[in-house]
Amino acid sequence: MSMLLNKQLFFRDLFRSRKMLSWLKKICWILFFLLCMIKLYAQSEVIPGLFTTYQQNGRILWVIPDSLLGRDMSLTTTILEGAGRKKKSADAKFGYQGDRFGPRILRWEEEKEQIILKEIRSYVDTSGSYSLGSLLAEREMPLTLQEFEILGCEKTGKIIDVTEWLRDGKLWGLQPFSFLIGIGSEREGRVTAILGTPESVIVRSERIYEAVERTPATSANGEVTRWKLGCCLRLLPRHLMQVRYASSGVGYFTVPYAHMEPGSCQVISDRVVKRWRLEVADRDTARYRRGELVEPRQKIRIYIDRSFPEKWRPYVLRAVNNWNALFERSGFKNAIAGLMAPDSAGFTLDNSALSWIVYKASPMENAYGRPFVDFRTGEILSCHIAVFHSVFDMLCQWYIAQTGESEEEFPDELAGRLLEMVVSHEVGHVLGLTHNFYGSSLCETEQLRDAVFLHRHGYGSSIMDYMRMNYAVQPEDGVDMSDRIPRIGAYDSLAIEWGYRYFPGLASEEIQEKLSVWIEKKQLERKYRFQDSGGNLPEAQAEDLGRYSLETAELGMCHLKRLLRDTLRNNGRLSVESWNLAIRKQYSEYINQAFTYLGGIRKCWGNDSVIVVAVGREEQQDALRFLQTYVLESGKDLPREWWEGWGRETVRRLVEKADCFVGYDREYSVTEYIRDLGKIFRNVSGEECWGRFLIWCYTDCLMEYIQTERNRYPEVVALMEEQLKVMYRKTDKEKDVFWKAWRKNVNSIWK
């Protein structure tokens, strides 16, 4: 009996000792962890922010809060210092301080005692189909970018080591954008600083890349480029912005949008527009419904970088703030503001919450505006507007070529007003607006020369057209130079109201239906019409002007004639080469406008539909006469290098235009067109070098068309062969060496 009792006591003590040992082990682990954390806190640099960052002995640790697991974040990359290059292309658009790329949408998740970073590359709105939502989510699996071991836990999150990961140039460098900026493989990279805010973490680094030529992508003689970058990982709002479906009646940049309707098993593919999240605060909803102006919950603020030259700042600020009047049509006051960036630590180019206008030292004669968008809804998160230094050379060229002025000075006030116009156009882009090439066709030719009309109304419906200075104005019209510069117009106001009018309580589909009816009614007026790509629409071309662009092009030619007589004088700002380039560019624009009439179409807006009709016979014949006058006849008065290029290209395009007449019932038939074209070239004199050049070009183009399109367009080929035979018979008795060679050339096609 006593032996049995002793055994029971022995096993009881053994069990207790093992249990005690287990508790002791747990206590030791806790003490060890606490000691590690004390050491971590004591010897580390602590950077608070969206993620708490610990830096110790070259190691970088992040604490990923449990509350942020499953939340979406945006990652953008900004160039803080661009690389100096031995040779940089004049048309290089990217690679300068302030250039921003992205965003990529990332998400942190916890799986199997690991922290997983995933990239969201596609999105389907499943809110309308609860039963299929999880199934669809499985189909749209995010891409796993990185897996992190959990090193420890804090009260609010998990600790991971990001040291090596932050050195990876694929996510934290310029590798994804290498072709845009002309770099090759990365040679070296190091993290230089980490900054934190409650909403973001900014990782700054220095990286060295091999330089490559953009075309072809080969190493540029072993040259290396050094870059300073800032990558901003920013928390996105928990609730997505309400989408607005795209419409063909108004021009907005769009993103693809997949969604499911209630009770449906089918994924519907749509497009939604890019726009800022302008919403009415709950306290202001009643006032907004009554038609009172209210301030949006979150305003659009665009900061001008302090590197921007001081004398141009007022024009840039005005270019932004002028859009406020348009937002008032949408019910918002003070919706957008252009501001000078304060000289404080938080206002940095790599903070993706901030939008910037940056001045860039570059030979590129341009500017651009880029909105950075959450692709899931089209919400514009921020924007970047670049103004290149050499844009003033382009503005000066416009001034000379479109006004015929050749004074020795290009006044700063005029340059500033033109800069304001350029930046206003780019602000329109970062608000989501695309080009509207119908905007310049609003006015009659007489209105374009009426000083009183121009002062009151301007001369276009949209700043989003490629509409430059009013070249229809002649010196005797007495129009002030400030009234020859485009302004924000009626279409721009309509487009902003369409995109930013707030509809409390309505679903996106209801808003779409409401806006469709509204925009169709508005487009009965010319000033509210939209056309994104001109194609063969004479009224919707880049660089054109007026309802009848052939008339205004002839007026514009008057300026160029004066300049051509005065090519040795220039305004001092431009070189002779740039002076000539300005004239050549403008001359080419007028030629291009005439070509759109040949085989062109017009849109006629009605109450129920838009009807497409062919351009009339007289207008097309006028276009032919324009090309005959200003290229085929005037070419001999131009410098040889000009007319050789224009002459050959014009003749080729005239012949190929025959394609546009095939298969359509037109007032001006393909037969009439080819015969009219033949008459023009039969009347070209073969006595001069210029005439012989044109005749030979015309013949070569006809022969090439006959050989390549015989099976495709036999009717057209027969007409062209007829024209060759007519010209052959006319010159059959000519004994000149040129005509002998010409007949021999033609005979080769009939062998």
Feature names for model-found ranges:
Residues 440-751:
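Conserved catalytic/binding loops enriched for acidic/polar residues
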Residues 321-332, 428-429, 433, 469, ...:
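Sec-exported extracytoplasmic/periplasmic mature domains
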Residues 32-41:
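Hydrophobic h-region of N-terminal signal peptides that target proteins for export
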Residues 383-414, 422, 472, 478-508:
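Polar, glycine-rich mid-to-C-terminal structural blocks
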Residues 43-308, 326, 341-415, 419, ...:
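Auxiliary tRNA-acceptor-end handling modules of aminoacyl-tRNA synthetases
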Residues 69, 309-335:
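Zn2+-dependent metallopeptidase catalytic core
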Residues 340-360, 417-474:
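The catalytic-center signature of Zn2+-dependent metalloproteases
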Residues 1-23:
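N-terminal secretory signal peptides that target proteins for export/translocation
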